[in-house]
Amino acid sequence: MKALNANISTMSEVSRSATPQSDSPAQAEVTPEVCIRIANFNAWYGSFQAIHNLSLDVPRNQVTAFIGPSGCGKSTLLRWINRMNDIVPSANSRGTLMIDELDVLAQTTDVVNLRRRVGMVFQKPNPFPKSIYDNVAFGPKLHLYLSRAELDELVEWSLRKAAVWDEVKDRLHAPALGLSGGQQQRLCIARAIAVGPEVLLMDEPCSALDPASTLAIEDLIYELREQYTIVMVTHNMQQASRCSDRTAFFFEGKLVESGPTQDVFTKPQEKRTDDYVRGRFG
């Protein structure tokens, strides 16, 4: 397993140096290291401007929640972080979007490598029509040079990390589509982390799940922040307050306010933020 961990660690350390982690979230708030830097960012779909001159720093190894009413630009921004909007013909952007020293928007950026470094978990679980094992092994087979034994170890490690190993260990070669919704979503998280990403993007990861599965995913998100930088879009105010370290509130394509989650929810600086978190609109 040492060789396997070294292989994954080497990939995760590309373009940045290892940084000691704080012992507690409170310490991390003092001088958080920036993982994602967004400056003067604008985005369009055709002639419609979805994001207006947005600037935001996303700290490393924390959970940052994007909140705001539908159409406010939060999912658009999330999808630009790993260039998912490249597949939208009318999508265009301008500004600065950096992950460490990587210029995400540069035409020379290797998008395949970018999406390995920046994993994505979608609103609806989307396992491949393959076995549970093959879902997790798919990415590593493309990006890593592993023996079968190392691949087996990585699949187990990823499923354990995603808190689903005990539920699937005796049926790894069964169809992934036979899992429950909550299990499928945790499988998708395992699939995302199997290639050693630095960042995990989550777009409404619990909206299609029952309360018990939602709680399991929320607990998992909070644990994963120790190793990954997580950016989560959610319409669920309680969820944002429970499992994020920082919150950014968007309205009509603009960033209204961002800061420690407790501050945004209990002592917001902007009236629109206060109205939104209190449920006066949305």
Swiss-Prot record:
<comment type="subunit">
    <text>The complex is composed of two ATP-binding proteins (PstB), two transmembrane proteins (PstC and PstA) and a solute-binding protein (PstS).</text>
</comment>
<dbReference type="InterPro" id="IPR017871">
    <property type="entry name" value="ABC_transporter-like_CS"/>
</dbReference>
<dbReference type="GO" id="GO:0035435">
    <property type="term" value="P:phosphate ion transmembrane transport"/>
</dbReference>
<dbReference type="GO" id="GO:0005886">
    <property type="term" value="C:plasma membrane"/>
</dbReference>
<dbReference type="Pfam" id="PF00005">
    <property type="entry name" value="ABC_tran"/>
</dbReference>
<keyword id="KW-1278">Translocase</keyword>
<keyword id="KW-0067">ATP-binding</keyword>
<dbReference type="InterPro" id="IPR003593">
    <property type="entry name" value="AAA+_ATPase"/>
</dbReference>
<feature type="binding site">
    <location>
        <begin position="68"/>
        <end position="75"/>
    </location>
    <ligand>
        <name>ATP</name>
    </ligand>
</feature>
<dbReference type="GO" id="GO:0005524">
    <property type="term" value="F:ATP binding"/>
</dbReference>
<comment type="similarity">
    <text>Belongs to the ABC transporter superfamily. Phosphate importer (TC 3.A.1.7) family.</text>
</comment>
<dbReference type="InterPro" id="IPR027417">
    <property type="entry name" value="P-loop_NTPase"/>
</dbReference>
<feature type="region of interest" description="Disordered">
    <location>
        <begin position="1"/>
        <end position="26"/>
    </location>
</feature>
<protein>
    <recommendedName>
        <fullName>Phosphate import ATP-binding protein PstB</fullName>
        <ecNumber>7.3.2.1</ecNumber>
    </recommendedName>
</protein>
<feature type="compositionally biased region" description="Polar residues">
    <location>
        <begin position="1"/>
        <end position="25"/>
    </location>
</feature>
<keyword id="KW-0592">Phosphate transport</keyword>
<comment type="function">
    <text>Part of the ABC transporter complex PstSACB involved in phosphate import. Responsible for energy coupling to the transport system.</text>
</comment>
<dbReference type="InterPro" id="IPR005670">
    <property type="entry name" value="PstB-like"/>
</dbReference>
<keyword id="KW-0813">Transport</keyword>
<feature type="domain" description="ABC transporter">
    <location>
        <begin position="36"/>
        <end position="277"/>
    </location>
</feature>
<dbReference type="GO" id="GO:0015415">
    <property type="term" value="F:ATPase-coupled phosphate ion transmembrane transporter activity"/>
</dbReference>
<dbReference type="InterPro" id="IPR003439">
    <property type="entry name" value="ABC_transporter-like_ATP-bd"/>
</dbReference>
<dbReference type="GO" id="GO:0016887">
    <property type="term" value="F:ATP hydrolysis activity"/>
</dbReference>
<keyword id="KW-0472">Membrane</keyword>
<keyword id="KW-0997">Cell inner membrane</keyword>
<keyword id="KW-1003">Cell membrane</keyword>
<keyword id="KW-0547">Nucleotide-binding</keyword>
